[in-house]
Structures are given as structure tokens and as C-alpha cells.
Amino acid sequence: MRFLLLLAMATATCNALATPYPDSGRIYRDFKDDSFFKPAPRRDEPKAEIEGATPLAAEGEAIFVQGFEVHGNTLLPEERIHAILSAHQGRELSGLELHQVAEELAAAYLDAGYFAARVYLPPQAVTNGVLQLHVYEGFLEEDGIAFTNPGARLQDEQVHSFLSSNLSEGEVLTVEAVERTILLINDLPGVNSRSTLYPGEEVGSARFLLQIEEEPSISGNIDADNFGSYYTGEERLGATIYINSPSRRGDQVVVRAVTSGSDSNYGYVEYNTPLSGNGLRAGVSVDYLDYELGKQYRSLDATGNAGELRGFLAYPFLRGRHFNVFGQVDVSRLELEDSNNSGLEADRTIDKVEFSLHGDHDDDHWADGVTYYRLAVALGDVGINGNDAFKAFDDQNSETEGGFGRFNYEFARLQHIQGNLSTFLSLSGQFASQNLDSSQKFFIGGPFSVAGYPTGEISGDEGTLLHADLRYDFYNLPWRGNLQASVFYAAGWAKLFKDTWSGWNDPNPELDNHIMLQSAGFGFTQTWDETFVLRGLLGYQVGSNETEDPDSGEATDGSSKNYRAWVQGIYYF
């Protein structure tokens, strides 16, 4: 059958080059990458301001302090308090030093997360050489939560839900509870907030005031890049619109469109909304891609489409200024169709559930830095709905139909070194239970991978990607804005098929199932406020190119050059 012959030839060519056949699964992944349409970074996360701090007393007559008595403590271990105070007993202390002792004890409460706690010296604080210290641990008084809200972006009921879900009246205020409250509200689209803690009516109590500030109801970005597929158009134009809190509940509508012209078009629509004040969100999205292959496949009239319907739940297990852990569950159905004028009908349906955990943590190790991570487990089923010839081809070769599982991981570290110098290291990868459909594979090549190679130069059922760069930031430039220059090295390893079959690498028996690509180069990122970002990257191939055509020496983009240049511009509004 002519169809089988052409399909076998195409697959053999694909295997000989160790590159993925340009089908809907591969092209869909090029557009699906959410790094293309993240919103502009928001300003620094605020923290609660504290009013009512007591100034130090003036220097007074020194008093001999034999010991200490602490009243009102229920939170700190006695051993911790003794360790702090024992260094000051058995000697004379001035009035200023007495207050410094109280401040040192208050700092211990702050370190433990009780940042509304206060330590006071009562009148006649020293009796028979024993200094009395009164601790007020800073509980939130009854009816101690208040807020101001313009109301155009967020209903008062919604603000109250977040406050009451995370702050408890009558209980001691902690850094974790206050930060979580503020940040969960700031995570809501269309609003920001400022907060203040001030003394309550009772001694040792506190009140919490939140001020809601409104942001634009519509925001978004327009972007242009050359990140697209060689076969469907490398130059692309995209736009993303965020409709923030249209129902005044903290919900959001996201609309994105990307086109490379007549050869590929992609659209994405998402709606997400909070389900409760504890940060739980739910959402649904739908997207659609259509394409037509160009270059050497133009004569085949090779076309296809892909569309996914997805629902998800997301929850912040930990939300703070320095430590975050988020969990998410996605349930989706992806439908893929590929056809040409030679009888190819490669229709597939992929049902999948994915469980993911991601987060970040900043610290002051070796100066300061941020660690990022993401772990994901996906379980799914591939149904082949194409014609009998395509089903037979899959059954006799890669056998992707049926259940599958994959595990993805990513770890990254942004580390400040000194002054304007920093470094970024990342390691990501994938493991699979069996041979995967092209839409589920691990891709290597392109601006966010091994940049010396075309987008998606190779794909594997399993793979690993290592990236390291050194960055230097320039500020107050003559043309305004800030510039970050970097040099990088990246290496990717791919196992093309989890399980090979007889003749899988025909007509190139020298082809190995394990491929490694390396690249080094330099790049820049120029930003002007939070309005415009311009990125450029030049990657050179390091070592041999195991993916090149053995006859022409060309990669999948039809070029034999050993470097690739990438450019992206994003305008935020």
C-alpha cells in the first residue's frame, strides 16, 4: 500500500536523523510551552507594618540584677528563655541595657514567628535584684480584623472569606498566618494589598487592617519571536489577554493566540476561580492548533490539528515570602489528527491525569539565592483512532497505544555570587513506563533547551537536560532600563525509545538509541520597567552533531551551520 510505504519511509527518515516526525503532537508542544505567555512580574511582596513599637528608655542609674522573672510566656520553651537571660544576670545593668534585654527576648519571639509579641518592663521592674519582664504574645483580639476595599475588583464577602480562613481571632498572630493571608489575597487577579498591625484595646492584643488596592481589569502582552517550527513557520506573533476578576470574586479569564501565518495557528482560553478563602482554585481550559507542513512535506498536503480540554485544581500548601509549596491536579483529553494526500490518517486520543508539586525557597546561603523545583506524575491512555493501516503500524513497531505513565522533574537554583554577578543552574528530565506518543515525549533543542540546535531537534521517551549560566546585571544605562548579559552551557541526553523493535533504526544501523547534544553561547535580556522585554540568544554546538542528516549534514531546520540565533520581544500592558 502506498500509504504504508510513505509512512515507513517517513519514519525511517525520522529514525535515521534521530529527530521527531513533524506531527501534531510535536507541533502542539511547541505552542503549549507556558513560558511564552507568563504575565509581567509583580512588584515585591509586601509584609505587614507594625505600629505602636515602644522606644528605648534613656540611660538611667545602673541596677544590680540577680535574676529574671518572665510573666505571660506560653510559647517559648523555658530553656530558650533561660539561655537568653542568663548572660545578663549577676551584674549591673543600666536603664538602656534593661530595655535591650527586653528587646533581645522580643527578638526571640520574632525568630520563632510570633512577630506581634511584645516584652515590657513594668514600673519598679526590679525587686530584690530580680527583674520582672512581662510578655504580651500578641493575640488577635475579638473583632480585630478590618479592611478597606474600593469594591470594583473584589466583593467584600470574598475579602472576608480569605481573612477569616487564615486568621483566627483570639489566637496568637504568627508570621506564617499573616504572610499567607496577604499573599493569597495578592495572588487574586486585579488586586494588591497593604496591611498594618496595631495595638488592640486589651493589653497584649493586636488588630489587623488590610487595605485593598485595585489594579487594571484587563492586562496582557504582545510577543514576537523566532521560536517556531521549521516546518510550520519559525517567526511567530502572539498576544495574551488577562481579564481580571470579571465577577468580582478573584476569578480570571486568559485568552492567548499565536500565529506563524497560514501554516500554523494556535488558540487558548482558560477560566479559573477561587473555591474558598484557603487558596484552593479550580479552572478549565481549552486550546486548539491547526497546521500545514511546508518545506519538503508541502507536496504531501500534510495537515493536522490538536485540541485539549482540561480541568484542574490547585492549592497552596505553603504560601510565604520565603517558602512556597503548591500542588495541582490536571485531568485532560487531548485529540490529535494528522493526514496527507497519500492516505495517512493518524488520529489519536490521549486521556490523562497529572499530579504535580512545585515550589520555591529563598535563603542567604553563599550570599543569597532562590531554589525552584517541580515534580509531576502523569498517568494516561492512548487510543489510536486512525485507519487500520496506521493502527497496524503502531502495533508492529512502537506500540504506543494503551496505558502509559511518565515522571517529570525539574530543579533549579538562582544564586547571587557578588555584586551584580549571579549564576543559574537547572536540571530537568523525564522517565517513562513505555514508548510514548509524540505529544508526551521529552524534547531537546531550542531557545529554552540546547540553544545551538533547532526547536525540538530530538525527542525521547526519556531524557535529561542540564543548563548552567553566569549572569551580570547592568543598571542605569544610557538608553535606560536594565540589561542582563549571560554566558551559558547546556547538555541534553535523550533515550529515543523506551523499548526498541526490530529494524527501528533502518536504514541507519549505526544510530544509537541514546543521543547527546551540547551547546554553549551567550545572551542578553533588556528590560524597560515592567513594560518591554527584549531577549537575544546565540548558541553554538559543542561536540559532534549526532542528529544531522548523514548525507547532507543538515539538522531538522535544513541548515548545516553550527549555531542558532534566537530573538524574542514582549510588550506588557
Q: Which residues fall in each region the model found?
A:
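Residue-level signature of outer-membrane beta-barrel architecture
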Residues: 212, 243-245, 273-275, 315-317, ...
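Residues that define the transmembrane beta-barrel architecture of outer-membrane proteins
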Residues: 204-206, 233-237, 263-267, 305-309, ...
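Short loop/turn motifs that connect adjacent beta-strands in outer-membrane beta-barrel proteins
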Residues: 247-252, 276-282, 318-325, 362-371, ...
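Outer-membrane beta-barrel "beta-signal"
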Residues: 241, 311, 531, 559-573
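Periplasmic polypeptide-binding modules associated with outer-membrane biogenesis and secretion
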Residues: 19-228, 257-265, 407, 427-428
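Outer membrane beta-barrel transmembrane domains
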Residues: 291-295, 330, 337-339, 391, ...
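Transmembrane beta-strand segments that form the barrel wall of outer-membrane beta-barrel proteins
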Residues: 219-228, 239, 250-261, 267-269, ...
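Transmembrane beta-strands of outer-membrane beta-barrel proteins
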Residues: 220-222, 251-255, 280-284, 325-329, ...
